[in-house]
Amino acid sequence: MTQYLPPNLLALFAAREPIPFMPPVDKLPHEKKSRGYLGVAKFMADFEDPKDTPLPKTVETRQERLERRRREKAEQVAYKLEREIALWDPTEIKNATEDPFRTLFIARINYDTSESKLRREFEFYGPIKKIVLIHDQESGKPKGYAFIEYEHERDMHAAYKHADGKKIDSKRVLVDVERARTVKGWLPRRLGGGLGGTRRGGNDVNIKHSGREDNERERERYRLEREREDREGPGRGGGSNGLDARPGRGFGAERRRSRSRERRDRERDRGRGAVASNGRSRSRSRERRKRRAGSRERYDEFDRRDRRDRERERDRDREREKKKKRSKSRERESSRERRERKRERRDRERGTGSGGDVKERKPDFRDMDVIKIKEEPVDDGYPTFDYQNATIKREIDDEDEEKYRPPPAHHNMFSVPPPPILGRGNASTNPNPDNGQQSSGDPSWWRQ
């Protein structure tokens, strides 16, 4: 088909010129002459000595970097803690109370509790000299603990014994003695010391009950709970170690030893400051015995009050249980049975209380098929009507009613006497025809 195309189109299908040949610059690979493979011994002198080779650079991984930062932070905290322990002196606190042996420590206070509320709650045990409610120095918010100084040491002991676990503003407080100035070597919790097991670690080691650490009953109950959780399994109890394996097991013994040391130190100080006079020593011993007797009486009074309160609570619980039982039994009964029983009891009481005369009760129209008619009050300006002696119109029964019967065919309709016309009188009573009325026998009188 292309041979029939015009020349201008045939030029489009013409072949291109071939590429011109150029001689190669180098010899071809098969034309070259090689000397074969040689060793590298002669090049060993060009390498450096292995002794002079630098050590490889190690790159720190992500885990190593996190561990390094954690270690550095722990070192800084330990250094700061050591420095604060060296500078800490509880005797130089500005807001501290005067006598530490008459000071009570109150913890776990509600943040909304005010100083006046604490005073009202703790003045029950004795007169209070000073209350120090601790606040944050930066934000000014309460920290949840306070110090209360009593005027007498026996009042402080009474509050220490009876106020522990008291609920103030819907929160149970913890009561303890001040230990910063009474126990040698004592440190607060922020410096690594302190007592209590609520912030030891996780849920498996923290103590959940509210109260002092030496509360043997609470500790025993908590230990039994931990053993029961361990028996149920680690999946439900949250740990396989019991209470005996936790750190800080001997806090109660340590606190008892610290109290005994406090007592010995106070007695030794009193012995040093005492005068050698026999009279003054006897008077002081007499005063001491009086104080002990007073504190003992105060303790006995508190114990009696506690027993009375517990008995009242038990009585109230019994009354509540009885009321619940009575209410349940009432709910089971139907309303009609209750109404009948009340009516019988009321009739019985009225019959026995008034010498046997039973008062007639009003009929209960709810149980009777009686229709009660409402009576209106009698008007003063109108006479009364006796309905009992009045004549009552009675309707005729259908059987006795006289049915309408049409007149016979021979009967003249005009023979029926018309009704009397007023003013004309009656023919039977006035037969005189001059009055304008015809006799009843004349049927055509009314047509005139």
Swiss-Prot record:
Residues 206-234, 262-272, 294-320, 346-376 have a biased composition (Basic and acidic residues). Residues 426-448 have a biased composition (Polar residues). Residues 405-425 are annotated as: Mediates binding to Psi. Signal peptide: none annotated. Residues 102-180 form the RRM domain. It is found in: Nucleus speckle; Nucleus, Nucleoplasm. Disruption phenotype: Lethal during embryogenesis. RNAi-mediated knockdown in the germline results in defective nurse cell nuclei decondensation and dispersal ultimately affecting oogenesis. SMART domains: RRM. PROSITE patterns: RRM (PS50102). GO terms for molecular function: mRNA binding; RNA binding; U1 snRNA binding. InterPro entries: Nucleotide-bd_a/b_plait_sf, RBD_domain_sf, RRM_dom, snRNP70_RRM, U1_U11-U12_snRNP_70-35kDa, U1snRNP70_N. Component of the U1 snRNP. Interacts with Psi; essential for alternative splicing of P-element transposase. Interacts with the SMN complex. Mediates the splicing of pre-mRNA by binding to the stem loop I region of U1-snRNA. Required during oogenesis for nurse cell chromatin dispersal. This is U1 small nuclear ribonucleoprotein 70 kDa. The lineage of its organism: Eukaryota, Metazoa, Ecdysozoa, Arthropoda, Hexapoda.
